[in-house]
Structure formats: structure tokens, C-alpha cells
From Swiss-Prot:
Ranges where the JmjC domain occurs: 307-452
Keywords linked to the UniProt accession: Chromatin regulator, Dioxygenase, Iron, Metal-binding, Nucleus, Oxidoreductase, Phosphoprotein, Repressor, Transcription, Transcription regulation
Basic and acidic residues bias spans: 87-96, 194-210
Cofactor note: Binds 1 Fe(2+) ion per subunit.
Recorded family membership: Belongs to the ROX family. NO66 subfamily.
Enzyme class, spelled out: oxidoreductase
Name this protein carries in UniProt: Bifunctional lysine-specific demethylase and histidyl-hydroxylase NO66
Amino acid sequence: MEKVTNSAAAKPQGNNKKQESAYNGAGKDKKKPNLDIETTDSDLLSDMHLDGTTEQKVGTLFSKVFEDTDYGTGPSTSSKEAAAAKTADHERRLQAEADVNNNDAEKAGQLAKESVATQGASATERKQAFSLGLEHTSPIQVNGAALACPLVRKSLPPGEANSCPPPPKRDPAAVKSAVKIIKVKAPEEGNNNNDEKEMSTETSEPHKTDSVEEGRRVVMWIIFPIKTKFFFKYFWEQTACLVQRTNPKYFQSLISFKMLDEILIRHNLDFTVNLDVTTYKNGKRETLNPEGRALPPAVWGFYSEGCSIRLLHASAYLTRLREVCTVLQEFFHCKVGANMYLTPPNSQGFAPHYDDIEAFVIQVEGRKRWLLYDPPKEADHLARISSGNYNQEQLGKPIIDEVLSAGDVLYFPRGTVHQAITEEQQHSLHITLSVYQQQAYANLLETLMPMVLKKAVDRSVALRRGLPLHTFQILGNAYKANDCGSRQLLVENVQKLVAKYLMPSEDDIDEAVDQMAKKFQHEALPPIVLPSEEVRTVHGARSGADDQGNCVCDYKFNEKTSVRLLRANILRLVTEPDGSVRIYHHVDNGLDYCKYEPYFMEILPEKAKAVELLISAYPYYLTIDQLPLKSSARKVEVATALWEHGLLMTEKPFK
């Protein structure tokens, strides 16, 4: 391995065998376990200076992800409250359906008027301007008790929320929806569930797991009890999917109100760059970001005024959330984004719009009403670019109108118009996981066809010949009515050139996919190395000095050492147009989006076969003497270089 430079890619290849999970597991005992450590909200926050003990705490918590869910504990008091709230919602909808079925139009109309009146009465407007002063930093309070903000600042006066009246509730009978609503109840203790066991499988050997399979397990955890195959066959890129649970603690380890306050204190976040303050009132969407650092008094001041808070790239500050994203990116083979949204009661932060991502809305705290609409035009289905804001008058009937409570998940495809409003007595904290942005066939063709054209032009003189002199006089919109023979002949000639020279070969497609995979390597989050993996990688290596002052490393490779890639998608082997061979990887990427230039190693072409074998062998180990290189010294050299860059892991620790 010669040159080490900064510049991005990795789509794995190989046999992805089903492995046991190192990340997701709750053991087979359905009773809630007693953890050996105490984990507070602050333990779940990312800190550049965490010591090994804290890192181990976080790792242990991640492996116990299912032990605090429906599958391990059964309904709690808060679960019963959430279930009661859902029952009330259901009864309200049944009543509305009965009104419609009985043709009781007057009664149904009265219910709608009462709903609008209640919402309007609670949507009081503050006339004073937004301020960063301490006089506006209090939480929303009712009769002196904090209702929306768990961080009560008693020394400050109460503030009233700016709110946006939500659209009137539609009769469910009038909503023709293709949405499948899955309502989930927590499994009872002692109930043997094969799916639950599959998700809860633990292993004492995480260094032998398959990272793609681990990603599938996290997807399974998010959408449980829906099977992943069923989800991708009937919902993915097709229609929305709602999973409702009775366990409000299902996602509590990802983030909390208190964690956000700690993030604001511990990290230097800037408005606009890291955090947005938004509001949607009277049909107008505004971003109220001041300049400078987003300090807690300023942020909570905006929140107490009824503004929504959006934390961008939340995985950079939350270790547990980053673990989820790094595992998911192995499954989806693309960047996994995570934004956090905090909305006070009776408020709306964003206008109706659609996005260019597949969205998983994870409700962590509180409740929020979501309204989804079909894409306005056929061209907006599976949109490649996010839309602007829509007026309420531009929207048709919603395909779904449901309230998400803590523990619920809502998936919808890109191009789905959506808006969300909090209820009068409930704040909302949710995370949106975004995947598959710019991952369409169109993106592949945008990369592929310029490459194909360039190669064809270099090979064929026919494409380099000049256009006929009369081309501008017979072709163009103004000349469509000119049905002369020379016009038709020129059109046919262009079509023949395209058919003959611009059909991509298999090699062309491989090259284009490699270029797209480079982009993933640049955007991906760096992997989180588990403790059992650390002792098998360069991250656990230590060096010292002998009596003469010479550096002594605590590792040494030989032909019998067994190695494999750290992750299935940890690197991408790319042959560049100039013929150079590079290994792009994301081991050293920053936590912020594309913080650094892409990382790569440039290698000799004859060494590429060794890397290809490591890719195809994953998730299995192979000995260094199996690498297809001529000499033993060259085999050890290649393996050592890859290991020292954090790309390989040994089967056994050196110590």
C-alpha cells in the first residue's frame, strides 16, 4: 500500500449470511432485567472526551435495546395512560362514523364546529416580538405547573404559546385511504413469540456478526411486528405505514427533552447551521433563527413562545441514536439522516410539504397529529427534490389523519405531502430518520450516461462529425410543422447514433455504481467499534519503547493470522478513469455531514485482487496466506496496511 490521501465509496459484495446480533437483544427471559450499570440521560449523549467506562455503558445499553420495550416489560402505568388516550381517539372516530352512517349531518357538523372552536380558543396570539431575553425563557405553564417543558425554570415568568389552529378533523368515513394501519399491543409476559425471539437474539461474539444483517434487525425493531420482507413488498416506496404501540418508553433511549438541554449546554451549536427555530401561523411559515450560538435561554425562550425546535444531524450529539444510524446505513447502503423536532402544545412548526427522502417518524415523547396527502401530481410521486410550502387550500383529502403517541412509528415515501400539529395539552418530541435520498435509477443514469457518451465519442468518429449546415433551419420547436424529408432523415440519424453508440455495457454500469458508492463513503457516519471489536482492531493497539528507545508495537501479523473486513460496507474498491486503483472508506469520517474531504488509499492494481477476495469473503474470516498475491511478504504487507487504517479486524485479539 503506497499513497494515503483524502478523497470517497463502498458497496460491499459477498455472501451476507444470517448472523446472530451483537446490537439488538434482550435475552430470552421476558422479565425486565436488572442492568449492572446505571445509565442516565447524560450517559446517552455523545462526548468527545468520554472515558472507556462510559463507552462501555453505552455499548451495554445498546445490546439491551429490547429489554426496555414492550417485549420485555409488559404494560406500565404510562402505557395504560397512552392506551386510554388511543381508546378515546378511537371512540371519537367511531362516533363520527356513526353520525355519517345515520345521515345525522347536523350533529356531525356541530362536532366539527366545536372542534374548530376549541382549537381557535386555545390559539391565542402574542403581539410582542420574539426576544432572546431571559424574560421569555420560561416553559409553558398552566396554573403554575409545567405542562410542556420538563425543564421548569421557576424564577422566570410563564409564557403563552403561539399556536396555529389545525385544520378541522375530517370524518374518517369520508377519507378513502390506501394506508395500512397496524395497531400493536405489548406481548404479554410468558408469551412465546418467534419473531420476538429472532429480534432478541444475543451473541457473545459480535466480531462474527454480519453488519448488513444487524441493520436488518434494527429495521425490524423499528417497524415491529411487521416483517421486513412484508414491509418492503407492500409499503416501501408505495404507501404510508403506521405502527401504534402501547409502550411509550419504546424509543426513550434515543433522546429526551432533558438530553436536548444537555446538548445545548455541552456543545457549541449555532442557529441555522445546527439548529432551526420555526413557526407556522395563519398559513405562514417562518424561520426565526438569530445569529450566533444556540444557548439554552435563547432556545427555550423561542420554545415558550410557541416555536418548534429542529436539531439537525442529531446523531452527532447522541451516541445511542448514532449507533442506530450507523447500523442502518449498512442495511440501506446509503447515508441515514436523523433530525429531531420538538414542538410545544397547540403548535405547528412547518407548512404542508413533501420531502425527497423515505421517512421514518419515530415518536419519542408526547403526542402529535399527522395528516398525509397523496402527491399533488404524478411527477411528484417518489420525488427527487423536496417541495416548497403548500397552502391549506391546495390540499385534498388526507389519506391518513392520525395522532402519534410515544412509541409509535409512521413511515411514508418521498413525495408524500404531510403536516403535523400538536394537541392543546401535549408537547411532541420526535425523530425523523431519513434514507434513500438521491438513490434512484435516475441518479445512476445521471452518473452513467455522461461516462458512456465520453467513451463513445473517443471511440467513434461518427459522433465527432459536424451537424449538417441546415440543422438549425429544419429542427427546433418553431420547425415542427415542417414535415420535409431532410428533417425526418436528420431525426432518424440522431436516433440511430444513440441506439448504436450509447447503450451502456456491463462494465460501464459497474463503473457508474462505483462512483455512486464513493459518494456514500464520503457521507457515511464513521463506524462505532464495540469493545469486543476494539481489541481486534487498530483502535485497541498500543505501542511502547524498549530499553534502547525503539518503538515496539503490541501486534504482529503472519500468514496464519485470520482477518476480515470491519463492516460489509466499510470500503469501496474503485478503478478511476485515469487507471489508478483506490480504496475509499469512511473509518475516519467526521460526525458532521461531509466534514472532511473523502478518504482513500491508492494501491497498485495487482493488489486489488486481495481486496476483492476480502470483500467477497465477508462476513467470514480468511487467513492472510489465502490472499491471491505472489509472495508471503506482500500478503502480510497488504493485510497490515488495511488493518492499520482500521479496515480489517482479526479473529483473535493480539493480547
